[in-house]
């Protein structure tokens, strides 16, 4: 590891070794992705029972090895059932989704790495199973046409870009703020019939466009890569919804609180947005287990608050409103 893996002047000193390790592993993973090969080959299943691709395993091994010498006591990975002890003298605990969006490898859509940093406690459980607001750092690396990192240490969102000349992340912006005017929402509309009524009602209002109660025309986006969705919303605004639904295995949502939702929520709030499970702020919650799932809504603060308001309506009112909308029934 070298000091040149990331520009460190705006990184808190006690977090610099871990950030240098994350940047180094991210740059190395970006190079592996650029070289190509059969990276989407199925190789097994992870701790959650999701299919693993070859690149999932490569990414997990790479980040684990690189963080081992960076002052990290505990490492929790989405790809592993239990947290791993790295350095008994380490002061940090890192939770990581080494490769988000691996289903997009074959189609060459942007994929990423999501990470979260906590102060290390005596046990892995105490380090990770705590309120998400106790994070001291969080971010993601996006591997797309340009490789970039967004990270927060609780004082705004910093934007770094990977310089291909020396594989170092250079600071692009010190305080990224999310626009609040984008008329865009991201949701997998194929699951409409399974959603709870407040989510259907919100989407129906958006789809009604200028003739509906919102009196504005909205565009829908869906990439099926959380990092790519987050990056677009940080840059352009809008809102992302991945609600719980009626399907088996989706009753509590699908995204993981520790590895995905907590770090993204920290970033989004630091950029001026909001992040909830549909009702309650993600940062006010904690994961009861390492792989706990949760519904997830994030984006421009006004839009996230509006969705929460739909959930607060009495069920009879939502049902009455829903009965008059039902645009997908036509």
From Swiss-Prot:
Query: What is the residue range of the signal peptide feature?
Result: none
**EC number, UniProt record:** 3.1.3.11
- What does the UniProt entry say about where the protein is found? Cytoplasm
Per UniProt, Mg(2+) 2 binds at: 97, 100, 260
CC cofactor: Mg(2+)
Which pathway does UniProt place it in? Carbohydrate biosynthesis; gluconeogenesis
Question: What is the recorded name of this protein?
Answer: Fructose-1,6-bisphosphatase class 1
Q: Which gene encodes it?
A: fbp
